[in-house]
């Protein structure tokens, strides 16, 4: 299948080109030419299928023309070596727990899939080395770094904002070594993202080394996130609650909700979506006004959503032909300051004995306030609460158990290189490699 750029000024690309390049030549994001609806019999029997089988059927619709069936199946089955259970929190609100992978965050799905797909293309082409640049506000760095760890022919550079990532998150990508290098940038997440984008646009740098991105701008990162929306629906169907399903997605860079919207286009029976923001509510403001006005990000306790200019908004706009009315018809918004996020975490722990992380709390609250009669809500619980241990403990007034997977990272020694937010320094560093 061919991929086109959201800016419509670049040549169409094959899947391999889209994955290896990451960003189109005109700075646009790649979109598949077609989103194929899955047959009705798939939805009729979806509740009898396991996660890996469902994911393979979805992956085949996107990637089947470009990747041999046995290879694609192996990539999907290797990626999803963990469960994504749907857990009942209240009578009509369920949590889709996306934190059972190696780094306890939803990004394990996209990170692991992309690492395996890129590895396949590199082997196929006999390429020597591909360099992956990834900007992170926390979970992306750990998921991508761990997904790519030890993959031959790939070196990963993780750029993260100094002092703005929790210690647990930082340890997950600064202690790995091997083919992973952590760069500690004296700036914000938006500065890190700007450095990555500038690197792709620099001709001299791209002649010096093969670069690609592992942020959700890469189709191999964001499309696999559609897998768990289908699996969530399958589990809801098993529970006899699949009627009017509403999915709420805590949203930062908007890759996650975009994957869900792709699922809806493939026929997934979701009534509507809610995009839940923290104070960085650029999308919420767009829904209210019809004007997209990016602004510098503000630090909040839901730090993975501290994004002032969400990259994937371009994909949402493209999907709906630029129509504000069409977007508003399928997606509503919610926005919460830290006080309300904390209050929700405290109440849900007290009333339901369910521990939310700050991002999941935004999702739960939007459903609690926005579900209509007869609807069933699913919110995406995107990371394990222990990844935000200090914040969560302060809010609920109790100790949070750290899973063994995280404890193992905490025992590692941090190794990172300091970097200014100026592109010339970053370029000089990469040119010296």
Language model feature labels by segment:
Residues 1-433:
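PLP-dependent amino-acid enzyme catalytic core
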């Amino acid at each position: 299948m061919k991929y086109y750029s959201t800016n419509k000024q670049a040549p169409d690309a094959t899947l391999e080109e889209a994955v290896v390049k990451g960003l189109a030549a005109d700075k646009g994001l790649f979109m598949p030419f077609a989103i194929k609806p899955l047959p009705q019999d798939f939805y009729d029997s979806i509740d009898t299928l396991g996660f890996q089988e469902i994911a393979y059927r979805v992956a085949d619709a996107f990637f089947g023309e470009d990747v041999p069936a046995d290879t694609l199946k192996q990539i999907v089955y290797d990626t999803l070596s963990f469960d994504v259970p749907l857990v009942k929190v209240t009578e009509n609100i369920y949590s889709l727990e996306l934190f059972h992978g190696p780094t306890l965050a939803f990004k394990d799905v996209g990170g692991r899939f992309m690492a395996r797909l890129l590895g396949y293309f590199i082997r196929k082409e006999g390429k020597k080395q591909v360099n992956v640049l990834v900007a992170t506000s926390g979970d992306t760095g750990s998921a991508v770094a761990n997904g790519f760890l030890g993959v031959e022919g790939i070196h990963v550079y993780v750029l993260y904002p100094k002092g703005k990532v929790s210690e647990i998150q930082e340890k997950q990508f600064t202690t790995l070594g091997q083919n992973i290098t952590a760069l500690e940038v004296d700036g914000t997440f938006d500065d890190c993202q700007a450095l990555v984008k500038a690197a792709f646009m620099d001709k001299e740098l791209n002649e010096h080394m093969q670069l690609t991105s592992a942020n959700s701008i890469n189709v191999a990162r964001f499309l696999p996130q559609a897998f768990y929306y289908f699996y969530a629906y399958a589990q809801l169907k098993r529970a006899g609650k699949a009627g009017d399903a509403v999915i709420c997605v805590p949203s930062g860079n908007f890759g996650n909700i975009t994957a869900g919207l792709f699922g809806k286009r493939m026929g997934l029976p979701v009534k509507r979506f809610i995009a839940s923001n923290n104070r960085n509510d650029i999308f919420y403001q767009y829904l209210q006004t019809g004007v997209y006005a990016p602004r510098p990000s503000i630090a909040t306790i839901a730090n993975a959503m501290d994004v002032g200019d969400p990259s994937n908004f371009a994909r949402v706009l493209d999907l709906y032909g630029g129509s504000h009315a069409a977007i508003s018809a399928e997606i509503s918004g919610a926005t919460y300051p830290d006080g309300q996020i904390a209050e929700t975490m405290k109440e849900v722990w007290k009333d339901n004995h369910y521990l939310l992380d700050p991002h999941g709390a935004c999702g739960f609250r939007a459903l609690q306030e926005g579900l209509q009669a007869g609807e069933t809500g699913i919110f995406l619980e995107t990371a394990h609460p222990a990844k935000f241990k200090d914040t969560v403990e302060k809010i609920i007034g109790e100790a949070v158990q750290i899973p063994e997977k995280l404890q193992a990272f905490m025992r590692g020694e941090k190794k990172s290189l300091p970097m200014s937010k100026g592109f010339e320094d970053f370029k000089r560093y990469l040119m010296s490699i």
